[in-house]
A protein has these predicted regions:
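Structured beta-strand/loop patches that form or line metal/cofactor-binding pockets in enzymes
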Residues: 1-46, 50-54
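N-terminal amphipathic alpha-helix/helix-capping segment at the start of soluble metabolic enzymes
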Residues: 1-11, 122-138
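Metal- or metallocofactor-binding catalytic centers and their adjacent structured scaffolds
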Residues: 6, 38-123
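Short glycine-/small-residue-rich flexible loop motifs, especially phosphate/cofactor-binding loops
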Residues: 34, 118, 155
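Metal-dependent enolase-superfamily TIM-barrel catalytic cores that perform enediolate-based chemistry
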Residues: 130-170
Length: 170
């Protein structure tokens, strides 16, 4: 069981040398929103919130977490990450209906859920993959963000960096 004391958000943007064309539009930077939860003993867990689009999506998700989810979580006690997920989903359902922002709310809950799972795993002194029931400490990875234009060069660069699998945008 954990009692949430507080949370923090941080927005990061990594400028891209070459803009990336995605199915959503052109990305000129790689945004990231991290949420860090603290329990009443000072143990923390970190999660990431999806925020690629629109361009102001990162700041918007951070604002949602700070203004909506932080007050909902503060001083709440949870038996499990699933209990917290259900609680947040239930508490924000009507807000989603009123605002039409089911996506940003769900993405924020997902990032908080990751942070909660990380926090519960840390309380048990387990790596997250083991907390989830995984059996391997390594998993295969692939390079993504390879666009049709200039794909051959981008693929060669990824292979040179050691990637053995690629995801090509078409």
């Amino acid at each position: 069981m954990i009692k949430i004391r507080s949370l923090e958000t941080a927005v990061y943007r990594y400028p891209l040398k070459t803009p990336v064309q995605t199915s959503f539009g052109i990305m000129r930077d790689r945004p990231m929103v991290l949420v860090k939860l603290f329990d009443d003993e000072g143990v923390s867990g970190i999660g990431e919130i999806w925020c690629n689009f629109p361009a102001v999506g990162a700041e918007h998700r951070a604002n949602l977490v700070n203004s909506i989810f932080s007050p909902l979580l503060s001083s709440q006690t949870f038996e499990s990450p699933e209990d917290a997920f259900d609680y947040l989903t239930e508490k924000t359902w009507v807000l989603g209906l009123q605002t039409g922002e089911f996506g940003p709310l769900a993405q924020s809950i997902a990032g908080i859920d990751i942070a909660l799972n990380d926090l519960f795993a840390r309380k048990l002194s387990k790596p997250l993959w083991e907390f989830y029931g995984g059996k391997k400490s390594e998993v295969p990875i692939y390079a993504s963000g390879i666009n049709p234009k200039g794909a051959e060069k981008m693929a060669e660069n990824a292979l040179d960096k050691g990637f053995k699998a690629l995801k090509l945008k078409i």
